[in-house]
Every structure is written in C-alpha cells, then in structure tokens.
C-alpha cells in the first residue's frame, strides 16, 4: 500500500495539476477530496492542453480509477459540460467514479454567491461566484442535496421544494432579486444526474479497496493551504479544507493509510482574489514574473497578484499539512532576474516573527524580512537533472529547503511533462 497527497502550499495555482498528472503515471487511483469547479487545473497530455475544473487529472489514464470524492461540491451542469468537453476531444471517461455522498451546487447557490459578493462591496472576499460557499453552507446546515438524492427524482423534488422556500425568501426579501420556480430546476438537473449516474458509487469503498489491495493511490488537492477555511487567511479563504487533513474527511480514507504529503510551491508566490499578501510586488519585476509565468486565473482569467517566495507561508503549510516533500515549480520564470529575494521572517511592530499570524490586523502591519540571493541567466528549460541547473539556481532551491524545513524532491522548469524532474521518489515506502 502506498498513498501520496498533493497539496498547494500557498494560495493555490502552484502547479498542482501538472505535478498530479506527473505522479499519476505511477498511481493506480487518483482522487479529489474537496472544492468544486472554483479551481482550475491545466494539464498537458500527449501534446494536447486540457483545462479541467471538476474532474481529476487522472482521467487521461483509462486504466486508472479517477475519483470525485465525497468532500467535493459538484455543479451537475458544469460536470456534464466537462464530460462533453473531454468526449469531444476523444477522451474515454469510463474510469471516472463519483461519490454518491458528494453535495451538489444548484442555481440558487450561484445566484446567492453573486449577490452576496456584490452586497459586500469593498469588503468582498473575491470568490469565483460558482456557488461553492453557499453549497458548503447548506451542507453544514444539513439542508444540502447530495448526488444520491439527485438520482432519485422523488427525493430530489422533495428536498428542492423545501430549499426553494427558504432560498427564494432570501433572494427576494434580502437581496431583492427574483427567486426560482421548482420547474426551473427540477427536470433539467435531474436529467444532468441521469447523464452521469453510471459513474456514481460509494467511492470510499473504491479507494479503501484499492489501498487494501496494495495499489498506489494519489490524492489531489485543490486551492492551497493559505485558502484553507481553518488554517488560511480567514475570511479570505475557500469554504473547505485543502490541507492534507481534508483527505480523510473528503475521501473516506483513514489517516493511517496516508504515507506521504507533497507540498507544491511556486518558486515565487501568487494569489488570485482579495486578502493579505505580505510579499506582493507592485514593480516591474512583478509585472515581468506575471507575464513570463502567464499568471492569469484558469477559472476567472483574472491577473494573479505576484510576490517573492515566502518561507513563512510554506513553513506554516509544512506544519499544518505535515509535508514530507516539496515540489518546486516554475523555476524557469525567475531566469534573468539579477537578484532574487526570499522572505525569511516578518517584522511586526519592530519585533521579528517567524510564524504566520492568525490576525489579519497583525498581518497587515507585517513587513517582510528578505534575504537576497544572486539569480541566473542561463536557460534552464532543457535541463534533465538537478546537476544540470546553474549553481545559483541550485543554491536558491537549497535555501528554500533549509528555510521551510522540507526536502525538495521534485522541480519543474516548464509546462511539459518532460520538464518535471524527480530528485527523490515520493512513492517510496519510507
């Protein structure tokens, strides 16, 4: 039995899809355990670029099981569209399994999400307006509708009718927006469910059976540790738990069956949406990194905010996710920058702190303490091993490992699969 969890160590968009796709080659099952179609991942497979939002990266390997876990919230319409997108490109999706316990996103969740973000004005969270938060709210309030409910029209109608009474009052009286009629949703969404019912099952059984049979299972996180609802920059976070601990809740696999946790980190830092970002750059270097790194959101198309690598953030990720390995991505983007900076600590009211503060007021007053390292000018996109990297690039990686306390086991120097390199296998048994 061998299992690996892939988590983002920053604010998402670290390149988890690429690393998951790379590690999928040696996995026999790949599972997502939280989030929804608010997170996009870009995968290049057999020379073709795919952009997915719901379906796990493992879908391209027809001999491997690809799982949408119970901890996810699934927009049935978006799922049907994504399946069609893959089918139109000739991708076989018969290896997909969808948890019957996953909750669904309905049109009222999306409308409430949009209305609430608009109402907040300057205090907005910066959500993708995909209905994720409201769907998780319903789940916590025990009024959510699960995929198993969607597949039974009588049950779906009963629950939908009950929820529409409450949601329409909220939309009409509080937000002053038009509500929904039962017939607006019932038949359309029931039909979506019928289109993917062949994939629906108890995925906890599927995953545990795979592990018990000695198979390799890969768990794919969405977003990142700093967007975790408990451990992130609350309230500027997502509504689920991207940290490694979310795996056990969102997949139905116990913690004793998790072997390694790979934290994916960019060689710099980015963020989409509002919220604190201590190392954010507002100068020409930030603009250069954004353009060279194509830093625009997969889901929203919004320009990402860009900053220097923050070891305080990644140390926090190491602690709360129990990272065993680090995968450093987009090293090539830093090529040509004369002097690189790594944030090693923060200054808060004149005092040096090395741990990430919980208070946003404190965080707003934090000033990054930087360590400068010489950059490199050599093109590294064609390297095939660690030894091929320029000395300054290797020193940069070594310093990140020292500051974060996590060994760098993988690094990537470009978007293609061949540009990802392994220093130490994360599939090791010890």
From Swiss-Prot:
Active-site feature positions: 13 (proton acceptor), 41 (proton donor)
Reactions catalysed, semicolon-separated, are: IMP + L-aspartate + GTP = N(6)-(1,2-dicarboxyethyl)-AMP + GDP + phosphate + 2 H(+)
Q: Kindly tell me the pathway this chain contributes to.
A: Purine metabolism; AMP biosynthesis via de novo pathway; AMP from IMP: step 1/2
Q: Provide one Gene Ontology cellular component.
A: cytoplasm
Q: Which organism is it from?
A: Listeria monocytogenes serovar 1/2a (strain ATCC BAA-679 / EGD-e)
Statement: the UniProt record of this protein carries the keyword Magnesium: yes
PROSITE patterns per the UniProt record, alphabetical: ADENYLOSUCCIN_SYN_1, ADENYLOSUCCIN_SYN_2
User: What job does this protein perform?
Assistant: Plays an important role in the de novo pathway of purine nucleotide biosynthesis. Catalyzes the first committed step in the biosynthesis of AMP from IMP.
Q: Which Pfam families match?
A: Adenylsucc_synt (PF00709)
Taxonomic lineage of this organism? Bacteria, Bacillati, Bacillota, Bacilli, Bacillales
Which sites bind substrate?
298-304
Instruction: Name the CDD domains for this protein.
Output: AdSS
From the Swiss-Prot or TrEMBL record, give the protein name. Answer: Adenylosuccinate synthetase
Q: What residues bind GTP, as annotated? A: 12-18, 40-42, 304, 330-332, 412-414
Its assembly, as annotated, is:
Homodimer.
Query: One MF term from GO for this chain?
Result: GTP binding
GO BP term, pick one: 'de novo' AMP biosynthetic process
User: Among its keywords, does the record have Magnesium?
Assistant: yes
Write out the entry's keywords from A to Z: Cytoplasm, GTP-binding, Ligase, Magnesium, Metal-binding, Nucleotide-binding, Purine biosynthesis
The protein's predominant localisation is cytoplasm
How is the cofactor bound, as the UniProt entry phrases it? Binds 1 Mg(2+) ion per subunit.
The UniProt record gives the binding positions of IMP as 13-16, 38-41, 128, 142, 223, 238, 302
Subcellular localization, as worded in the UniProt entry:
Cytoplasm
